Amino acid sequence: IELAFDFVNALNHPERRARLEKRGLYDGRSFTKDSRIALVLAGYTEDEITGEYIKKLKRKRDKAATDAIFIEGVIGGSRRTENGKKIFSLWDTYVYADFVTYPSCWEGWGNQFLEALRAKLPIMLFEYPVFKADIEDKGFSVVSLGSELADSEDGLVLVPARKIEEAADQAVDLLTDFTLREEVVESNFKIGRRHYSLDALSKYLLPIIDGRQ
């Protein structure tokens, strides 16, 4: 998750904010000096039993003044009211998102990746091992942080600074160029449907069921 903090901080660099302000956003919205580039952490944040990971993230946020908002307390699998408190669906957050960050260093596969494809949002990700082994060759267009990690002094991880800078520049284009954005998200959606939809599932299962594999 800390890699997403670095990504947002790079987007908030004055030069990139100036580009966003000059071009305006992909959907016609203006971007002004008062506009926020916020990282919203909506889903479950994995942690150690000690809770130290979240503490480290919040220290990093506060030190760099990252606009990061933890809202997992009001997000659930579906909309409901719990003890008088409104709980929103994770899908509600996708409606308001302009970009999905998926900086996981390790995943069993990557369901959140599929969610981002379905929501038709551009994706920034770290090339975790399963992505490289099972997903990368399908041809998805993503903003990549590469696949090299290093430990940082604060007990978190980092990637080469140039990868963060390159990712932020690509994100500016996807946030401001409607045509480019549509080409990317529509192409990703079609690739996802071809390989990972329920229709595609039958292609993988039938040979097994028929004993042909």
Describe each PLM feature range.
Residues 102, 122-125, 132-136, 142-147:
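Short hydrophobic beta-strand element within catalytic cores of glycosyltransferases
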Residues 1-26:
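A conserved mid-protein helix/loop that constitutes part of the nucleotide-sugar donor-binding site
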Residues 26-92, 96-99, 141:
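Nucleotide-activated donor-binding/catalytic signature segment of Leloir-type glycosyltransferases, i.e.
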Residues 91, 114-118, 132-133:
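Short alpha-helical segment that forms part of, or immediately flanks, the ligand-binding pocket
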Residues 1-7, 39, 116, 167, ...:
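A structural motif in glycosyltransferase catalytic domains
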Residues 161-166, 175-209:
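A charged, aromatic-enriched C-terminal amphipathic alpha-helix characteristic of glycosyltransferases
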Residues 105:
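Aromatic "clamp/platform" in nucleotide-sugar-dependent glycosyltransferases that forms part
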Residues 144-180:
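C-terminal "capping" alpha-helix adjacent to the active site of nucleotide-linked donor transferases
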